[in-house]
A protein has these predicted regions:
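Flexible coil/loop and intrinsically disordered linker positions at secondary-structure junctions
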Residues: 1-109
Length: 109
């Protein structure tokens, strides 16, 4: 749970609606949980980037399966994900995407 704590601190209230650290942990680890993780309005692209970064930390054996299940949990279409997940680090990111990418870089380095 320790490695998810900075993500929870940074993203809950910004990219995700309010949720406890325990429920956040359960959702991210695909455990059954009555409180579903919900993306805030206009944050789906940044969540796609976060999913990408998190999936890169997983072994190849689990990466695709976890990504597919978390996309389904968050109601993100795979084609949308594939077209948007790199936007925060594209050649011309928006200011908010650029800020988010820098915050995530400090967490994931």
């Amino acid at each position: 749970m320790k490695s998810l704590s900075p993500i929870h601190e940074t993203c809950v209230g910004e990219q995700f609606e309010a949720i406890t650290i325990a429920d956040f942990y359960a959702n991210i680890n695909l455990y059954p949980c009555k409180n579903k993780l919900k993306i805030k309005a206009r944050e789906k692209i940044r969540v796609c980037y976060l999913i990408f970064l998190m999936s890169e930390k997983l072994s190849k054996q689990y990466k695709d399966e976890w990504r597919d299940k978390i996309l389904k949990l968050l109601d993100i279409d795979e084609s949308y994900y594939k077209s948007k997940y790199k936007e925060p680090v594209s050649d011309f990111p928006s200011d908010s995407n650029q800020k988010f990418a820098k915050e995530m870089e400090s967490i994931f380095r």
